[in-house]
């Protein structure tokens, strides 16, 4: 499924732009939250 999505994104610059925005606004904060949680658990 992930591979299909990647192919679609490559074929569609507009989708790619939206995906980049999505990653910046959703995925990165989420990753930061996860890292903080892991760090707290390791303390």
From Swiss-Prot:
Domain of life: Viruses
The protein, known as: Uncharacterized protein ORF19
Organism: His1 virus (isolate Australia/Victoria) (His1V)
């Amino acid at each position: 499924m992930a591979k299909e999505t990647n192919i679609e994104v490559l074929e569609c610059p507009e989708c790619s732009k939206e995906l980049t925005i999505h990653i910046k606004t959703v995925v990165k904060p989420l990753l930061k939250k996860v890292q903080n949680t892991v760090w707290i658990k390791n303390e």
